[in-house]
A protein has these predicted regions:
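Hydrophobic h-region of N-terminal signal peptides that target proteins for export
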Residues: 9-18
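Residues in and immediately flanking transmembrane alpha helices
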Residues: 16-17, 65, 126, 149
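General helical structural elements
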Residues: 7-8, 32
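Conserved nucleotide-cofactor-binding alpha/beta core module
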Residues: 104-167
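Class I SAM-dependent transferase core
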Residues: 20-112, 128, 143
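Positively charged n-region of N-terminal signal peptides that target proteins for export
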Residues: 1-5
Length: 167
């Protein structure tokens, strides 16, 4: 009986998460279009390179709302940084796109990210490279990020607690 109740509870939680993910699709698509618009506006600074379609696709496939407290679609995909706790923020989507693009990482690369935060940047990178090693100095953030990344199946991301200055 207890196993059945646990299974039902798990199914209910999974269904709720899937429904929320589906609800966020329009906000995620709007975020990608906002990034494209910023790239056009900043073309005089970025040059003809802009932000690659691979990066935009990765961001369009990554559930940003799963990496913010409360998992609110409107908050997660807004055009600005979002508080994630411990006095830290998840970067504005355009900044994530720009950093990811400027890294120019290739599929066979291993990337070291310093400052895991919520894990969102690592998740975006994980769609583009073979392996992401990320280091976070604030244990509660590292633990939360590792949990979300594992829950979402990012098996190519390794989260470590430590001072990124030490590598």
């Amino acid at each position: 009986m207890m196993k059945k109740l646990l299974l039902l509870a798990f199914i209910a939680v999974a269904c709720e998460a899937m429904a929320q993910d589906a609800q966020c699709v329009p906000e995620r698509a709007a975020m990608v279009e906002t990034i494209r618009a910023y790239a056009r506006i900043e073309a005089n600074v970025l040059g003809p390179r802009s932000v690659s379609e691979h990066v935009l696709e990765a961001m369009g496939q990554t559930d940003r709302h799963r990496f913010v407290p409360g998992r609110s679609c409107s908050v997660a995909y807004m055009d600005g940084p979002v508080l994630i706790g411990q006095g830290q923020t998840i970067s504005q989507p355009f900044i994530v796109a720009l950093m990811t693009d400027l890294a120019a990482a290739k599929f066979d690369d291993t990337v070291l990210e310093v400052g895991t935060g919520s894990g969102y940047q690592a998740a975006v990178l994980a769609r583009l490279v073979r392996k992401v090693c990320t280091v976070e100095i604030i244990p509660p953030l590292a633990e939360a990020a590792a949990s979300v990344l594992k829950e979402l199946g990012y098996d190519n991301v390794s989260v470590k607690i430590g001072d990124g200055y030490e590598g």
